[in-house]
UniProtKB/Swiss-Prot annotation:
The protein's name: ISWI one complex protein 3
Note: Present with 1770 molecules/cell in log phase SD medium.
Annotated region described as Disordered, given as residue ranges: 1-137, 672-693, 749-787
Acidic residues biased stretches: 751-777
Protein's gene: IOC3
Gene Ontology cellular-component terms listed: Isw1 complex; Isw1a complex
Keywords: Nucleus, Transcription, Transcription regulation
Assembly and binders: Component of the ISW1A complex, which at least consists of ISW1 and IOC3.
Biased composition regions of type Basic residues, renumbered to the chain: 79-92
Length: 787
């Protein structure tokens, strides 16, 4: 225990300490109040030494920013790059019932199980993910140009291809330089058939040759006759193997065609409607009239305008081949005036030289075929054979350019409500002639599956379902019912028979195509006016590295044709199969207006690659032959089909192994020896196959398609030839003749012979009357008289 004296001393010290502390606090307050005055007056205070702040009056020394941050920049450069953080997950969209922002949602705590996988606690609730909105199925797109019944025929297909004529060398192959002109005439008659007489609508290529006295050339060049055979090279003229009346009939047809073209060129106020009502403008009566001005009047008008319209190339003065047409022919002055011009801005004060340039002027009047005065009496037969073809071709061009009736018809064909989906192309051909029958049918099947999926997807869409329930889509409802019937029939069919059944349900598929596509692969290309003007009706096929094939036959367009080969693929196949199975014959053709079509045919090969390259390079094509005859009747057609077998077969590969290689080598040698023997015996045929290069594989396929098509075509062509022989002078119709009608038989042997003879004569007279009524020569050409 402290003593009282010590405690008193301690109390006194505490009191002094507290008083000194109060004085210190009081002094501190005074210092703090006086500090600002002191800092304002002193300017030498340093913050680094005294840890005091710098005076505002002291300027801050200028330092480089790079110096200040140099070390920091070095540290950042040496520091390794951080990995890019993963993008944050998107938050679920907030809803109206979500909690307010001031309430923070508690995070779900997870506990780690023994296996290391996080598990939710028992009090946590599982949140089911929201279902994604279902996307509507999109209807498959349909490109109209891929599903048309007609395909454009482009010359650019042969841009990098070259043909070799000798590959198709066979005994029946003949150069025909006039084939292109006659095919052009036949195409003009075919497209504007309403302006021509019915006897001109079934002309065959042979009718033109006989009527114009033209002969196809032999393999060595043009000839003035037809070669009798490979062994006998003597030439035959048409009177040597044809009846004179048939030759005269063909010549009369050519004069009728010539007069029809003349009248059609200069006629006015005549169109297709008046031709259907009143008939053709020119008939046999006009040709056989006693007037001497049948040809003279239209020929007089033609001679006046021919120079303005333009003469054909063959009737113009030909320029010498060694003459440069870019240089003038003659000059009025020997040298041009070279006096310097005083005023260069007016050089016309000098006398210019007058030049005469080369021009393809028409032939002189004495050698111009158009001014042949014999044409006023004999028509086109007054000219030479090749001049006849040239004049008919020129008349076709003049008629198409200046005839008002043809202009009106062309305007109707080119100004329809719709245009071709593939654009305006110069030439168009049916799809099955390019792609073949099987590929065209497969295209139709693909289209059916696409159309079915489009309707099925459409029927499930909400707005369509609503409209169907309200009855606002009757057309769609009807199509869905048709589709339902088709699916029911296909469902019950066997898998192997589905393709045939799908093909047989064509009539039910057609309404489903309406409104979806303007055309479809199996439609009839000859019934659509949209394609009529540019359609190549005589086209048969195109083979790469070889060329095109044509079979000119009339006529393609007509409402009365019941057995026409110019129809859609379905009807054509059905017709060809019936002739192939002998269900139809020549008499069936005769009953169903078979004589309104060409009874004869010729198959031609067109060297399109050579023509395309010659035209592109600016070469002169006159005098060159691009058309070749391959067959002219059903017998030579069979020979051509056998010839195609040599070209379709692919050469065997030389790489063989072991004994098979030796055996096949021996077989190949034997086969080569056989080929050499055949070619040696018959050098006019080339039996070598196409080259083994892979680029010729497409050519082999196309030749196979052409062979199959011609093989089916053979049977109907043979019946047409038989019909021409059996029913040459008879008018077609379904009325049976008296001689083939079934008559009652008299079994009584006791009859008066004189009575029988009288009855027989009466029957013959009746038959004669019928033949007079049915004869095709009762229209001003030849008339029979009863005796």
């Amino acid at each position: 225990m402290d003593s009282p004296s010590n405690s008193i001393q301690n109390l006194q010290q505490e009191a002094q300490g507290s008083s000194s502390a109060q004085l210190a606090d009081h002094d501190h307050d005074r210092v703090s109040m006086a500090m600002p005055l002191q800092t304002d007056q002193s300017v030498s205070v340093s913050q680094s030494s005294d840890n005091l702040r710098r005076s505002r009056r002291v300027p801050k020394p200028r330092t480089s920013i790079y110096d200040e941050y140099e070390e920091e920049l070095k540290e950042r450069a040496n520091k390794p790059k951080r990995k890019r953080p993963a993008p944050p997950k998107k938050k679920a969209p907030s809803t109206q019932n979500s909690k307010s922002n001031d309430k923070v949602e508690k995070k779900k705590t997870t506990s780690i199980a023994k296996d290391g996988k996080p598990t939710l606690k028992t009090n946590d609730k599982k949140v089911a993910p929201k279902p994604k909105p279902a996307h509507e199925q999109v209807e498959p797109a349909l490109i109209p140009s891929n599903w048309t019944s007609v395909i454009p025929l482009l010359t650019s297909d042969f841009k990098n291809q070259y043909s070799v004529i000798s590959r198709l060398k066979n005994p029946n192959m003949k150069p025909v330089p006039y084939a292109g002109d006659i095919i052009k005439l036949m195409a003009f008659i075919n497209k504007f058939s309403s302006f021509f007489h019915s006897d001109l609508q079934n002309l065959s290529f042979q009718d033109f040759e006989v009527g114009l006295d033209l002969y196809p050339g032999d393999p060595n060049g043009s000839a003035a006759g037809i070669v009798k055979g490979p062994e006998d090279t003597s030439l035959l003229l048409y009177p040597d193997f044809m009846a004179i009346k048939d030759i005269v009939y063909c010549q009369d047809k050519m004069n009728l065609l010539f007069l029809s073209l003349l009248d059609l060129t200069f006629t006015e106020n005549f169109d297709g409607k008046s031709a259907k009502k009143k008939g053709p403008l020119t008939t046999w009566e006009n040709l056989k009239s006693s007037s001497k001005k049948v040809f003279s009047n239209p020929l007089y008008r033609l001679r006046l305008v021919a120079r303005e319209w333009g003469y054909p190339r063959e009737w113009r003065q030909q320029l010498p081949s060694d003459q440069d047409i870019s240089k003038p022919k003659t000059a009025l002055f020997e040298q041009d005036e070279q006096t310097p011009v005083v005023d260069p801005s007016h050089p016309e004060i000098l006398t210019p030289n007058i030049y005469t340039w080369n021009a393809n002027e028409p032939l002189p009047l004495e050698s111009n075929p158009l001014y042949n005065r014999e044409m006023d009496k004999n028509g086109i037969l007054a000219l030479k054979p090749m001049d006849r073809v040239v004049l008919l071709r020129a008349l076709t061009d003049w008629c198409a350019s200046h005839s008002s009736a043809i202009h009106d018809e062309i305007y109707k064909l080119t100004h329809g409500k719709k245009d071709p989906v593939f654009g305006i192309q110069t030439q168009q051909v049916p799809r099955y002639t390019i792609e073949g029958v099987d590929n065209t049918i497969n295209q139709f099947k693909k289209l059916c599956s696409l159309i079915q999926s489009r309707y099925e997807i459409r029927s499930k869409k909400k707005h369509f379902v609503k409209q169907l329930k309200e009855g606002k889509k009757p057309d769609l409802s009807r199509k869905l019912e048709i589709l339902k019937e088709i699916k029911a029939e296909l469902k019950n069919a066997v898998k192997s028979e589905k393709d045939e059944l799908l093909f047989s349900l064509y009539d039910k598929w057609v309404p489903l195509f309406e409104g979806e596509l303007p055309d479809q692969p199996l439609a009839n290309p000859f019934s659509e006016r949209l394609y009529k003007l540019r359609l190549q009706e005589f086209f048969l096929g195109r083979v790469p590295h070889i060329g095109d094939f044509y079979m000119p036959r009339l006529h393609s367009y007509g409402d009365s044709l019941e057995m026409s080969t110019f129809t859609d693929l379905r009807n054509l196949q059905a017709l060809l199969s019936k002739f192939k199975n002998n269900e139809y014959n020549a008499f069936t053709l005769f009953e169903n207006d078979g004589q309104s079509m060409s009874a004869q045919f010729k198959l031609f090969y067109h060297d399109t690659p050579s023509l395309a390259h010659d035209v592109a390079r600016g070469r002169n094509t006159s005098g060159k032959v691009y058309w070749y005859e391959l067959c002219h009747d059903s017998a030579t057609l069979l020979e051509f089909l056998e010839f195609l077998d040599y070209k379709i077969v692919k050469p065997q590969d030389e790489k063989k192994e072991g004994n098979e290689k030796e055996k096949e080598a021996l077989n190949n040698e034997a086969h080569i020896l056989e080929q050499k023997s055949t070619t040696d015996n018959n050098p006019s045929i080339n039996t070598n196959p196409l080259p083994k290069d892979a680029k010729y594989n497409t050519a082999r396929k196309k030749l196979q398609i052409l062979k199959e098509f011609l093989s089916d075509y053979y049977f109907i062509l043979r019946q047409f030839e038989q019909m021409k022989v059996q029913f040459a002078d008879m008018k077609p119709g379904k009325r049976q003749l008296r001689r083939i009608q079934r008559q009652t038989v008299n079994y009584n042997t006791e009859y008066d012979s004189e009575e029988y003879v009288d009855d027989e004569e009466d029957d013959e007279a009746d038959i004669y009357d019928d033949n007079d009524n049915d004869s095709s020569f009762d229209d001003g050409r030849v008339k029979r008289q009863r005796t």
